Every structure is written in structure tokens, then in C-alpha cells.
Amino acid sequence: MKIIKYSPLFLASSIYLTGCSDSETQANQVNEQLTKSADEISKPVVYQVFTRLFGNTQTVNVPWGTKERNGVGKFADFNDAALQGIKDLGTTHVWYTGVLHHALVGDYSQYGIKQDDPDVVKGRAGSPYAIKDYYDVNPDLAVNPERRLVEFSALIERTHQHGMKVVIDIVPNHVARNYHSIARPAGVKDFGEQDDTSKEYARDNNFYYVPGQSFQVPSSEQYQVLGGDAHPLADGLFNESPAKWTGNGARAAKPDINDWYETVKVNYGVKPDGSYDFPTLPASFATKDARAHYEFWQDKNLPNSWYKFRDIALFWLDKGVDGFRYDMAEMVPVEFWSFLNSAIKMQNPNAFLLAEVYNPKMYRGYIHQGKMDYLYDKVGFYDTLKAIMQNKQAASTIFDAQQQVADIEQHMLHFLENHDEQRIASPDFAGNALWGKPAMVVSTLISRSPSLLYFGQDVGEDGSENAGFGTPTRTSIFDYIGVPAHQAWMNNGQFDGANLTPEQASLQKYYKAIMALNNLPAVVGGDMHALNVQGSDRVVAFSRSLGRQVILVLSNFSEQQQTITINLNSQTTANIGANSALHDLLETHSGVLVSNNDQGASFTLTLNALSSAVLTNKVNNEQ
């Protein structure tokens, strides 16, 4: 699927043209965009799947259970039916989470893989963000672990055959405490292999050290390794001398139990006092393209870790991976991202680059200087939408959150669930998956932002299983577990939804209908205006417009029916047509009559509990 990214200049001209009859050439260009086929126009839709959980059919779900007991999914489970089901949600990119070889409690020594110490592994299956070999994939995911890279390559090919791109994680901020690559190409030095461990910091060291002190495993009365199950390596000890700084920056030889103690911090030339040991990027580069950034770094002498991660990214691009999701990107200097991402874009200009950044003050720097394509819109949009769903804020507050990033909205990824966040259906979030219906409508249609769906979200997965490490409400990323609602859709590998309840099947159908609206030009590249709502503070209402196409979106964030009146200004009235009958592209609110008034026009509509309407007139929709 071709993703069309409208430039700000194009967007401005298309909106301006609604009132410019003398700009015939420009008007024709806009209307040409409006008549493109659905295959040519779309916003990116990312489907995040936790790879080891996706194909698991076991339903035992014993806390801290082994893969033999609780089961584990494989690359091979993503068969044609599974991939078509993912594609049917409008997916353009599949983010396969947990692909790279990370620390885990399991014995693959017959394949030359050293066992991991449970004292520095979270859960039994292990965190996907404690990577122990950047040039290898998780042996748990292979039917034949000896051919694990071949099996992943086959998955890449199958995904491409279904018209979707492949995204995997890269975690530049930290690596597993027991990092050791057995799959690295000839001549590639391992992380830390050439470090001067007598120094806390040296520019070309890959890690930071605590000279003269050995690492001590953190302890807590509330935590037992593997839930107390016996293991020959679970002895409260891990041999690391001198100790390294922990992944979240903790500098003690014995980190706290709440630190990221299973990982170690990577050194990018940031001194312990926070100053930089590398060239800074001139401010003018905020407006320069990837090639200019790439050329800037070519004659610079840079810290060793920069080159290591560049080589890792290019290695996976060569394998057919189409992009990366960067974990905790804000903990790594923006200059490094300029260096890495520009190198990636020189190899694949269409590479998809998504970063986890939570500090709004850093958003624009990581987009413009760091050359990120997309950032999480969690702090702001997600947090506000969640508060609205929990009835803690008025529905209209979503517009304040959206306005904060209006200038960069096309770079801000919208989501309601991911591996870090609570499931909508969990009691600590909304307690009912149906709350995802109005929220997904607003999240998807309010702006040019791309969308993310987490596996199981569309069938109401509630994350209630006690997998071992951590607590329910989030589907476990640390242990082997079955995902019940998702398994109902999976139907033992048929991926036909035969075991879904009527409610689950209806919810999935609704998600598909929402995501199909991403093909509307007004949604892909149109302007957004909040609409005046009378009669309820639980309804979000806005218009999206591009050229002559206008849609009106109304979503009810209440478990009670809401009757509202929407007042339209003269511009919207002119585009949508006074005294016209609107029809609903999503639900069944057809025959809504628009009536003239002194300010323009208005209409009255009754929305059922947690329902939405996406209104337009037929002529408008066809143009």
C-alpha cells in the first residue's frame, strides 16, 4: 500500500481552495487527490503484536509457567490466514515485538547459546527490551531453533506478500546485563569487548562502570526469582566485576529492585556530569533533510557505540526489515538519532522510524533534528483520552491536547493500547472493551496522525491473567501466557474468529469499519475543526475537510443515550450543503437533516451509549 504524506503546503492550498474559484489548476490538483483509489490513499496503521504470545494455543496459564507448560508462539504461526486477518484491520506495518534475541530462562545450550541467569531476568520468558544478541533472533520463536534466522526471514517475506511492512524493536539505551553476541558478523566487536573497565567513563567505552566494586543482585521481601521455583542458577548472585551502570541510569553496584537491573546503560559519549563528548548539531539542521544530516556526520570522529548501532540497523535492513521502533529514545542524545536515522534513510528512504518519547518538550527536537518519522503521543493525547473514558475530564478537553501538537500532528502516533499500557477492558482502565469504540473513532479520525492497534484490542482482551512477573491489567511481556480473547479469534490457527462471542465479533467488525475510514482523503490530509455541541459535555464532535470533502465526527463518551444539537458555521454549511440529508459512514444514523439558521446551519442527533456517527452527504462523499 502506498502511503501518501501530504505536505503542509499542499494541505494549506487544499483548504484555501474551498473558497478560491479562480485557482482552477490548483483546484484540479486537490480534486485529483480526492479521486485516488483506496489503495493509493491511507494513513499508516501499525499493528503491534507480541510475537511469542500471538500463536500460543495453550490455555493452562500457570503463573511463572514454562514454555512447555504454558506454551509459546512461533514465527510460523503467522500463516496466510493470520496475516490476512491483520491486513483486514487496515494494517500497513506490523510491529513484531520481541523478535531480537533477549535474555530468557531456558536451555538452548545445544545451539551454542549460553544460559541466562534468572537473577538478572525479569519473568521466565524475559523482557524483550533486555537484548542479549543484536544479530540474532529469539530461539523461542522458531520451530527449529537452529534455523531461527531462516524462519524469521520467511516471516518477513510472508508479511511483504500480504502488502504490509515489517517493523522490529531496537533498544539503543541499554542491553541485557549478560549481553554476548554469538551471531555477529565476522570482524564485528562485541559490546564492551574493547572497554577500559578501570574507568567509570571513557568516550569509546560501550558501558559505564563502577570501578572497584562488583555487581550485586537487588533483593526485596516482595519478590522471589521465578516465583520461588528452584533453578540451578537462581542463587542471588551474578558475576559482573566491575559493576556496570544499570539501564535506567542507576549508578550503584547494587541497584534497587525497581531499577532496570536486568540491563546495563549504553554509553553514547555523555559524560557522568551530563556534558557531551561529541559534536553537537547546528540549530539550522532542524530544517535540513536526511541527506544533509548524513553528510554532516561523515567527517566526524564519534563514540564507538554510535557505529555499533548504525551497523546493527543496517544489518536488519539488509535482511528485509522495513523499519524500527526505538525503545526509550529520549534517553539517548538527539545527535545520535540524527546520525543513525540519516544513515538508515540513505539505505532505505522509506524506512519507518517510530520512537518512544514521553517528554513533550523534546518532541520537536527528536522529529526535526533527530529525523524521527513518528513519536508516541502518550503524554497529552492518550492520557487525556483515557481520562475522558474514565469520566475524569470533559470530552472537549481532547481538543486542548490535540492543539498542543497541531504543528507536528502527522508525526504523532495515536494508540489506546500497547504492551506498556493497560488493556481498555481491564478494571483499572475502563472495565469494558466497548469504551474503545468512541475512543478509537476519535483517535483515528481527529487528525493526520497514524494509528496503532495492539493485538487482542479489537476483540476486547482484558489482560487479567496472572502470568508471574508483574501484575494483571496489562498482557504480560515477561512470561509465557495464553491470551484468551485473542485465542478465540485465532481458533487453533484458523484465524477465522469462530470461537469469538457475538459481542467480541461485533467489536472486531466495528474496529475494521473504523480503520477503513483511513482511506478518506479528508481523514488522511484534511483540516480539523471542533464543532459546537449543545446538550452534553460527554460528546466529542469535530469536522475534517479537504477540498470539497467534509465529514462530521461525533462520539458519545457516556453509557447513556445523548441527544445533542450541532451548530455548523457558514463555511462548513457551504461545503456540506444546507437543507441536506446526511448519512453515516460508520453506524446507522442516516437521514440526519441539516437546517439553516442565522449562524449557518444545525442538526439534532441522538447517539446511543458509547456510539459514534461519521456523517457526510452522498455527493460530498463521492467527490
Range-by-range predicted roles:
Residues 24-165, 173-175, 179-184, 188, ...:
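N-terminal structural segment of carbohydrate-active enzymes
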Residues 50-53, 95-106, 169-179, 327-333, ...:
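Short, solvent-exposed turn/loop segments enriched in Gly/Ser/Thr/Pro and often Arg
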Residues 226-303, 314:
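Long, low-complexity, polar/charged, intrinsically disordered or flexibly structured peripheral segments
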Residues 1-7, 12, 18-50, 54-56, ...:
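Carbohydrate-interacting/catalytic domains
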Residues 45-47, 94-96, 166-168, 324, ...:
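Hydrophobic faces of well-ordered beta-strands that scaffold small-molecule active sites
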Residues 72-86, 301-317, 436-440:
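Short, acidic/polar
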Residues 43, 90-92, 162-164, 320-322, ...:
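Short, well-ordered coil/turn segments that N-cap beta-strands
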Residues 30-31, 156, 174, 186-189, ...:
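Active-site-proximal helices and loops of the catalytic beta/alpha 8
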